[in-house]
Amino acid sequence: GICISDEVQVGGGRVGKSFWGFQAHNVIPDIITIGKPLGNGHPIGAVICKKEIAESFANGMEFFNTFGGNPVSCSIALQVIKTVKRKKLQKNAKLVGNYFKNELIKLAFRAHLINL
């Protein structure tokens, strides 16, 4: 089988504990898809895969993307990654995430609408 990790929602330090969501599960995916966190609102995406999978595209099948390799988008993605690291946004995501989780747990005990 093939393991695919879709990092569109959880990638780029958003889970706090690790930079990529799959790292929290101690797996190494065959394919990783990255989108929204990479461009912080600017349209960009990426697919990262193991060498064997990439080589399977060398059989003559062509892939075309209108905006593929756009230098502006690539520059923005690089700056987003640098900003996340420089401003320690992954650490902040962990702090805010823990706070939010704890507040939801408190709410669950006060309001009988949430079942834990």
Give the positions of each predicted feature:
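Conserved N-terminal phosphate-binding loop of PLP-dependent enzymes in the Aspartate aminotransferase
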Residues: 1-116
